[in-house]
């Protein structure tokens, strides 16, 4: 997809992106195994002044592997250039273990390392409880 239009400087900005997804499930035992690989890339071209144009890029790629009926592991990579300073790059790596407690609840444990544009690193750990309320695809109400 793509879009273009005027920006704050009354000049033009163009943005675009492409998303690719691959999903695999075996014909047999397909409630116990699956694999998804999803990647997306974004591009921005911003005309700041008549003489200054800034181009920036961002992307992510993730792979998710179902290792049991209710368990998944996921790895993700992020890359982003600052739209105002493309030399400033942020990169992040994460790994997640997810468990489907029920069809309405998912519990995830995630570790993430982010490398800031100044090359400092931050480390995070998250425990998430995701729950669904209301109408969903499994039941018609």
What are these regions (language model features)?
Residues 26-35, 70, 104, 135-141:
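Short loop/turn motifs that connect adjacent beta-strands in outer-membrane beta-barrel proteins
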Residues 50-51, 64-66, 70-112, 141:
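Outer membrane beta-barrel transmembrane domains
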Residues 1-56:
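Surface-exposed beta-loop-beta
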Residues 18, 33-39, 73-75, 95, ...:
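Transmembrane beta-strands of outer-membrane beta-barrel proteins
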Residues 18-20, 99-101, 121-141:
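Outer-membrane beta-barrel "beta-signal"
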Residues 2-6, 24, 41-47, 77-83, ...:
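Transmembrane beta-strands of outer-membrane beta-barrel pores
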Residues 12-18, 53-59, 89-93, 121-125:
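Residues that define the transmembrane beta-barrel architecture of outer-membrane proteins
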Residues 1-13, 17, 60-66, 71-73, ...:
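Glycine/serine-rich loop-strand microenvironments at binding/catalytic pocket rims
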């Amino acid at each position: 997809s793509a879009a273009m239009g005027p920006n704050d400087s009354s000049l033009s900005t163009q943005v675009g992106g492409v998303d690719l997804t691959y999903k695999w499930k075996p014909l047999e035992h397909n409630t116990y195994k699956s694999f998804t690989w999803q990647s997306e890339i974004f591009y921005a071209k911003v005309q700041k002044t008549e003489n200054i144009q800034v181009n920036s890029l961002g992307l992510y790629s993730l792979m998710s592997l179902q290792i049991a009926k209710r368990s998944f592991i996921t790895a993700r990579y992020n890359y982003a250039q600052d739209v105002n300073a493309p030399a400033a790059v942020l990169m992040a790596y994460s790994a997640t273990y997810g468990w489907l407690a029920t069809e309405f609840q998912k519990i995830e444990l995630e570790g993430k390392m982010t490398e800031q544009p100044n090359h400092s690193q931050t480390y995070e750990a998250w425990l998430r409880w995701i729950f669904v309320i209301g109408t969903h695809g499994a039941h018609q109400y």
